[in-house]
Amino acid sequence: MSSSITSGFIDLATVDEIEKYMYGLPDDGVSMAHTLTYFVREFKKSTWFTQVPVPLSRSTGTSDFGQNWSVSISRAGDYLLQTWLRVTIPQVTLAATATPATLSLRWTRNLMHNLIREITISFNDLVGSRLDNYFLDMWSAFTTPASKRNGYDNMIGNISTLTDPVGPGGSLGHTGGTVLNLPISLFFTRDTGVSLPTAALPYNEIQLNFSMRDWKDLLILTDTAITTGNPYQTIDVSKHLGGVAPSLSNVQVWANYAIVSNVERKKMGCGVRDILIEQVQTAPRQNYTPSTNPMPSFDIRFSHAVKVLFFAVRNKTSAAEWSNYGTSSPVVSGTSVNYEPSGSFDPIATTTLIYENSNRLGTMGSDYYSLVSPWYHAPTIPSFIGYHMYSYSLNFFDLDPMGSTNYGKLTNVSIVPHASDAAVKASTGAGDGAGANYNQSYEFIVMAVNNNIVRISGGCLGFPVL
């Protein structure tokens, strides 16, 4: 092999009009003055700070399955950057005496998502933002990159020791429990530039409020001997769990704070500051019955500047299968679960978005909402069936305004999800393959992510535009 520095000068001698347009050239003093070089690094300086994660210790209520409880956000740190929920899921054993012997027990998918019925952040009595398990499903599906997906699944409970079914005498989880973590995707966690200036809010009692589901809504018991009917069974504590109901332990909410210099801290509360934030609005869930009404129309009543819509049809045949957005129910075989069996398809074929009797989007195929739209406007494309989005923004994950529609100025907005043939068949028990050969039931879910403005003034947080 050989190469010579001299040959590089030949490259430099090929300069022409295109190069003069693209580059600042040494003989052009005007363009050189406004041209960077890749060989002298310019550093962006910042104020002096540090960051530290701490557990939030002041809580009210019982932090357990099926309970509502709150934790107070400390103002000892200057800026709140991120928060996450850390819990220990107990080991659960299907009683050895449980009959029939073909019973199997497992935790639901996306366990940490579905443990949450709702999370809100409140400032005194003012709710600043809220999210639920459906948003957590959608947000993670469209924003979690493949390089972090495995780690995220480990955090939220998508691990074999929890989701692989066990028979009588078998146990889910480890002795002493399994530690899981849920990143809480509220507005201040999106970027340090919109972090919550807790030190500037001395007159607000800031709380994170949790509404959690009962364990009965998260554990799934099936009879694998039933292959042509509904295999889901009701869990009896005394019969199936040895009389011991599961209970969470070591429940903690952690917060990552930035601590700044005294000079910056003094300036934090000196003036009025407006922050552009993101909020989540979820419409009431609606029954979806493809066999009797394959083209239902649902009113969607949102407000503020909506940047993206997420929607899906949830398969609710098993009440505890919260994250199933396909036409079929999961199929249990031995110690494994096929969440998307061969007969499982997207329940939605096309979707129409209507503004006051005028089509905003007319019968657009689900390939657009599940593949094309996220390809251009989202960080990732979901690897699961049934996730849909429509973005008004060029990039909905970007904090800068890049497109939105003010739903507060619209009236009579509706969405029409046209059922797929697979959904029509599965709803009557005539679907193809296991998991769709008994009646499937569905509900429609739609939510919006909108922008709003919060104002920090006089030691309190408020909304100048409600």
From Swiss-Prot:
Subcellular location: Virion
Transmembrane segments: none
UniProt GO cellular component terms: viral capsid
Gene Ontology molecular functions: structural molecule activity
Presence of keyword Transcription regulation: no
Domain of life: Viruses
Signal peptide region: none
Keywords, ordered alphabetically: Capsid protein, Late protein, Virion
InterPro entries tied to this protein: Capsid_N, MCP_C, MCP_C_sf, VP_dsDNA_II
Subunit structure: Homotrimer.
Entry function: Major capsid protein that self assembles to form an icosahedral capsid. Represents around 50% of the total virion protein mass.
Family per similarity comment: Belongs to the NCLDV major capsid protein family.
The name this protein goes by in its record: Major capsid protein
Organism: Invertebrate iridescent virus 3
